[in-house]
């Protein structure tokens, strides 16, 4: 596994290189896409990106947890969590990339 993290600036630069928009336009395009995705998720809508995966928001109910230091029971409040499900194509791409790094051995 790699420790490399791709940042917004790097994504914006990749859009600039690939699409040929100006750097400012590339950054604006990336921000618009991310704003649209996050806005839809905030409303509770699912976001499906073909050949990539789907994002959805799931509600988790209240439950009882335990403080690991004291063993005391603690209520955990209900909340919404973000869920990402990769597409089969993305899973295959990732697994093929891992196999190539290991020299083709599975």
Curated annotation (Swiss-Prot):
<dbReference type="Pfam" id="PF00216">
    <property type="entry name" value="Bac_DNA_binding"/>
</dbReference>
<keyword id="KW-0804">Transcription</keyword>
<comment type="subunit">
    <text>Heterodimer of an alpha and a beta chain.</text>
</comment>
<dbReference type="InterPro" id="IPR005684">
    <property type="entry name" value="IHF_alpha"/>
</dbReference>
<dbReference type="InterPro" id="IPR010992">
    <property type="entry name" value="IHF-like_DNA-bd_dom_sf"/>
</dbReference>
<dbReference type="GO" id="GO:0006417">
    <property type="term" value="P:regulation of translation"/>
</dbReference>
<dbReference type="GO" id="GO:0009893">
    <property type="term" value="P:positive regulation of metabolic process"/>
</dbReference>
<comment type="function">
    <text>This protein is one of the two subunits of integration host factor, a specific DNA-binding protein that functions in genetic recombination as well as in transcriptional and translational control.</text>
</comment>
<keyword id="KW-0238">DNA-binding</keyword>
<dbReference type="GO" id="GO:0003677">
    <property type="term" value="F:DNA binding"/>
</dbReference>
<dbReference type="GO" id="GO:0006355">
    <property type="term" value="P:regulation of DNA-templated transcription"/>
</dbReference>
<keyword id="KW-0233">DNA recombination</keyword>
<comment type="similarity">
    <text>Belongs to the bacterial histone-like protein family.</text>
</comment>
<dbReference type="GO" id="GO:0006310">
    <property type="term" value="P:DNA recombination"/>
</dbReference>
<keyword id="KW-0805">Transcription regulation</keyword>
<dbReference type="GO" id="GO:0005829">
    <property type="term" value="C:cytosol"/>
</dbReference>
<dbReference type="InterPro" id="IPR000119">
    <property type="entry name" value="Hist_DNA-bd"/>
</dbReference>
<keyword id="KW-0810">Translation regulation</keyword>
<dbReference type="InterPro" id="IPR020816">
    <property type="entry name" value="Histone-like_DNA-bd_CS"/>
</dbReference>
<dbReference type="GO" id="GO:0030527">
    <property type="term" value="F:structural constituent of chromatin"/>
</dbReference>
<protein>
    <recommendedName>
        <fullName>Integration host factor subunit alpha</fullName>
    </recommendedName>
</protein>
